[in-house]
Amino acid sequence: MTQLADLRRTYVLGALSESDVAPDPMSQFKRWFDEAVTAKLPEPNAMSLATVDADGQPSARIVLLKGIDDRGFTFFTNYESRKGLDLAANPRAALLFHWVQLERQVRVEGRVEKVSDDESDAYFATRPLGSRVGAWASAQSREVPGRDVLEQREQEYRSKFGENPPRPPYWGGYRLVPTALEFWQGRPSRLHDRIAYRLQPGTGWQIVRLSP
């Protein structure tokens, strides 16, 4: 087996200072995200979403960012999935973007709210037909006897709805409204740059440097 202690790399691609970053974190995120897209990274909108249930049990999974604006970060899912039930019990969550090739991470924390039905309908209509049918066929996060059951359900809903399946009432979007963000740039000797934004009531965003 590979010796895990030997798996390491030196980070040399960039630096980040307080004078480099935008005054608000959403502008800074868009800047870094655009650079990740320009670098042709695979799925730059992939992010880890961490939630906590009513008993304090955490869980995490990779989801795709589908919207970003001054209000926050938008993603879509089944409201009855594990993450949906977690968010119903505890509407706070964390996101993590890891752009390995750029030696960068972005951490986001905040409260989560459902987007409007109109927003969910508009996004659902852009999804491929198979994904729209799949939203009906899959009771996400629940046990299923076998893949054949999923495929049978898919065929049933494809026959039922044809080319225009509507959005299921249990499926839609969430928006994470950030209260804290951290931008991490790898540096040599593990002295990484960590610039954090913290939302201060009544005064806006505070920018601070954190020790690596």
Swiss-Prot record:
Binds 1 FMN per subunit. Signal peptide: none annotated. Its EC number is 1.4.3.5. GO terms for molecular function: FMN binding; pyridoxamine phosphate oxidase activity. FMN binds at residues 61-66, 76-77, 82-83, 105, 140-141, 184, 194. Keywords: Flavoprotein, FMN, Oxidoreductase, Pyridoxine biosynthesis. Substrate binds at R8, R9, T10, Y11, K66, Y123, R127, S131, R190, L191, H192. Homodimer. Belongs to the pyridoxamine 5'-phosphate oxidase family. This is Pyridoxine/pyridoxamine 5'-phosphate oxidase. It comes from Cupriavidus taiwanensis (strain DSM 17343 / BCRC 17206 / CCUG 44338 / CIP 107171 / LMG 19424 / R1). The lineage of its organism: Bacteria, Pseudomonadati, Pseudomonadota, Betaproteobacteria, Burkholderiales. The gene is pdxH.
